[in-house]
Regions:
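Short coil/turn segments at beta-strand junctions that form active-site/ligand-binding loops
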Residues: 1, 28, 111-115
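N-proximal low-complexity "stem/linker" segments adjacent to membrane-targeting elements
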Residues: 1-25
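Short loop->beta transition adjacent to catalytic acidic/histidine clusters or analogous donor-positioning motifs
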Residues: 3, 23-38, 57-61
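Short His-Asn-centered micro-motif
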Residues: 5-11, 33-34, 118-120
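Active-site-proximal specificity loops/subdomain of glycosyltransferases
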Residues: 37-118
């Protein structure tokens, strides 16, 4: 049985270091997805640097999400405050779900009986 630890990355190097060190002996692969867009839709720089985690480089599968999800709702100046907020929340959820689902692009060699953990 293999265990795959899959999660989204923003810029939490301290937490990531703890996670990798603590779980290393149990995990077959760490699948990390980083997006070029924040959940609010603003373009962002990528922060993950494999050189900070050389000890784990053979276990890390790093994926970059370089595009927005389909179905992002346009926000208009003429929208009321409540409508704008609703659209911001909806779009944020779409980005979050899309990035999380993007993890499947890094899952390889999973057999029946293996565990795939998807978390934050």
């Amino acid at each position: 049985m293999k265990i795959f630890d899959c999660f989204m990355y923003f810029d939490e190097d301290v937490v990531l270091d703890l996670r990798l060190n603590y779980l290393n002996r149990y995990i077959e692969k760490f699948i990390i997805v980083e997006s070029m867009y924040a959940h609010n839709g603003k373009k962002r720089n990528l922060n993950f640097d494999i050189n900070n985690f050389k000890k784990f480089k053979d276990k890390i599968i790093y994926l970059v999400l370089d595009h927005e999800p389909p179905g992002i709702v346009g926000i208009n100046e003429s929208d009321s405050f409540d409508i704008k907020n609703g659209k911001y929340i909806l779009n944020s959820m779409k980005r979050d779900f899309y990035q999380r689902n993007f993890i499947q692009n890094g899952i390889k060699d999973v057999d029946n009986g293996d565990f795939v953990l998807i978390s934050d």
